[in-house]
A protein has these predicted regions:
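Amphipathic alpha-helical "output/dimerization" segments
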Residues: 62-83, 87-90
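Charge-dense, extended regions
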Residues: 233-481
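Helix-to-coil/beta transition segments that act as allosteric "coupling" elements at the rims
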Residues: 24-50
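Charged, long alpha-helical assembly modules
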Residues: 145-286
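Conserved structured core elements
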Residues: 20, 24, 37, 49, ...
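Signal-transducing coiled-coil/dimerization helices and immediately adjacent hinge/linker segments
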Residues: 85-183, 192-195, 250, 275, ...
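Regulatory sensory and allosteric helical modules in signal-transduction proteins
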Residues: 1-27
């Protein structure tokens, strides 16, 4: 009955429901509740179906053709009222989501809408409950990171160079001042500045930056207004000192800016590339995706039946995402390679994929406004994620991650075999050079028995990623079956 009314797009009059042929369970329930006479009217707003209006009576004939003529005239008013109610409900739901959860990934927004609606219904009924837990079970994780190699060393070197230059400028003011008016205190201060410079020549220790800047701001710079009166040479040197300090914090920010700009260029380029490719991956199959930028770009993917509103999921899409991830990591490696000529600081990028075939559960942490691994058993995955980029090959001092390569870390033999099939295809497509390194890793705290495959990205071959991806789904079918 309802299906018929919606398909026809017309008001449907049922004179006597007990004589209606082939009644569905819904219609049987209506008869049992005493409904005999009935009108079902589809409601449309801007040509889109938004609901149905039902009028019922226990007496056959109460609703007839004449009634329906009058009803047709007011149906648009009902449609507008329902649309307004739906908009108001959606506004309240979005307000709850924004307050409780901040921005939500589109792939899982449906689950948050359900939870928000349920919470609003409880509040309306006078039940002051918290929003229900949001947990997704049976989820397959994928994790990848493009890490700037030795970023801490480069950052410290930049800070060190800026501090030395800052001290040299201060020492120049003191020496010219002493040359103009030989006050022993100026010579003593110049000596202490030199001591700080000598210390920085050896290493930059924790706290050195704050100590040196405090020394300059507290003991040296307050003298400058008085020293200017010593003569034009001193005044010009002081003006040059202040002109060099570009930072609002009153520090020299030259080499550090070159480093920060280089890191930002890498991050923004890789992140933009990843966003473009992720949009294509979402079109293949919906999944949860997140990325973070620090000294490089890391991203996580969660996929599984419980993330899909209708619960339809096939392992094909999991294998497809794993292959897609490997291909995209190749693209990120090439993006990083192309940037080298534009970087003010010569930075290298290493790439890693963490493989896990065992599904896990994720829970939304309302206090932290983010998803996290749920359950103590699943925490091993998080531990490995945090420590794997520093892993070394067993029996050597060599880091697993190397510039221009992709390392795939796994713990089960079947995981390694599956990725070798992906690698063979990607090598044939021209993304990778021939050959695979099979290595065993040193034990990490909380994670033992890890292995890795390491491959080298083809940087010089002119390959087009889209050409290979056009046949990706069919390729994955062959690999799976």
């Amino acid at each position: 009955m309802y299906e018929r009314a919606v398909k026809q797009g017309e008001l449907l009059l049922i004179e006597d429901l007990t004589t209606y042929p082939c009644r569905t369970p819904i219609e049987e329930k209506l008869v049992q509740s005493g409904v005999r006479n009935m009108v079902v009217a589809p409601l449309y707003y801007q040509d889109a179906l938004i609901g149905t209006l039902d009028l019922v009576s226990p007496h056959p004939g109460d609703l007839h053709a004449l009634n329906t003529l009058k009803l047709r005239e007011v149906l648009p008013l009902f449609s507008m009222a329902i649309k307004r109610s739906m908009d108001e409900l959606n506004t309240r739901v979005q307000a709850v989501i924004k307050e409780q959860c901040t921005a939500i990934h589109p792939a899982v927004e449906w689950r948050f809408r359900h939870a928000a609606r349920h919470w609003l219904h409880q509040r309306k009924a006078g039940v002051m409950a918290e929003i229900e837990p949001i947990v997704f079970d049976g989820i397959y994780p994928l994790y990848g990171v493009s890490d700037i190699r030795g970023s801490s060393i480069h950052r410290n070197a930049a800070i060190q160079a800026d501090l030395v230059e800052h001290l040299r400028l201060a020492q120049a003011v003191l020496r010219i001042g002493y040359g103009t008016k030989p006050l022993p205190i100026l010579d003593a201060l110049a000596y202490h500045v030199g001591q700080h410079m000598a210390h920085l020549d050896t290493a930059l220790a924790a706290g050195d930056e704050l100590t040196i800047l405090d020394f300059l701001h507290r003991e040296i710079e307050p003298l400058f207004p008085h020293l200017r009166a010593f003569g034009p040479d001193v005044d010009e040197t002081i003006q040059a000192y202040w002109a060099t300090l570009e930072s609002p914090m009153g520090t020299l920010y030259r080499r550090r800016k070159e480093f920060d700009d280089s890191v930002m260029l890498i991050n923004e380029t890789l992140s933009a590339y990843l966003d473009r490719e992720e949009e294509k991956a979402q079109a293949m199959f919906p999944h949860y995706f997140e990325q973070h930028k620090s000294d490089g770009v890391e991203f996580g993917i969660y996929v599984g039946a419980s993330l899909v509103e209708r619960g339809t999921f096939d392992q094909l899409y999991l294998h497809n995402l794993r292959l897609w991830q490997l291909m995209v990591m190749c693209g990120m490696a090439r993006q990083a390679e192309r940037l080298k000529g534009r970087l003010q600081v010569p930075l290298e990028v290493a790439h890693l994929i963490l493989v896990q075939h065992t599904p896990l559960a994720i829970r939304f942490r309302f206090d932290e406004k983010r998803f996290d691994i749920d359950g103590a058993y699943n925490m091993r995955y998080e531990l490995v994620k945090k420590r794997i980029d520093k892993a070394r090959i067993r029996g050597t001092h060599e880091r697993l991650t190397q510039p221009g390569t992709i390392a795939m870390v796994y713990s089960q033999a079947q995981e390694g075999l599956e990725y070798q099939e992906y690698i063979a295809y990607v090598q044939a497509a021209g993304y990778l050079t021939p050959g695979i390194e099979h290595v065993e890793l040193e034990d990490l705290e909380g994670a033992q028995g890890l292995h890795a495959l390491r491959v080298t990205v083809e940087m010089h071959e002119a390959w087009e990623q889209q050409d290979a991806r056009d046949d990706m789904t069919e390729t994955v079918r062959l690999l799976v079956h």
